[in-house]
Amino acid sequence: MALDDKAALVLMKLGHLAVQRDREAYLRGLVDLCSQAVDAERCTVYIVDHKKKELWARVAQRTATEIRLPIGEGLAGHAALTGETVNVPDAYADARFDRNVDLRTGFRTLNMLVVPVWGSDGRVVVGVIQALNKRNGAFERHDQMLLEQIAETVGPVLEHIPVEG
């Protein structure tokens, strides 16, 4: 499937997801869609809690563990702090990678694609989408472009999702 066709299909699915009123169902659907879009083994969508200066995720594929990370810590925290997309072909070779999440979840991260999600004003990062372990290789430029397109679309929704705890 060509990138434009795949992007169109993903954006259409995002449109269907947008009518979901249940926050947990929306986040689960978003996590699944992101994972399918870039052929990742696992995906996590973090919400930025600016008051506590941390990232929060309760909905991550195949884990019931709530995840909280300080902004600036790990690759997801780095993306939230800098607003930069991070594509890492070997997670354990990158000094920014936080191995503690793998230890807590029992998951082994090989490679990562981490994309900041900007709020509707385009000035504040409101979330981070993190894709882990591209099937059959490392994440490529077209994966990054597609995940960035998803992030741009969901930003206005994520900025209105309350952070728990």
Where are these regions (language model features)?
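Allosteric cytosolic regulatory segments
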Residues: 144, 148-156
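Signal-transmission linkers at sensory-effector interfaces
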Residues: 1-25, 36, 126, 157-165
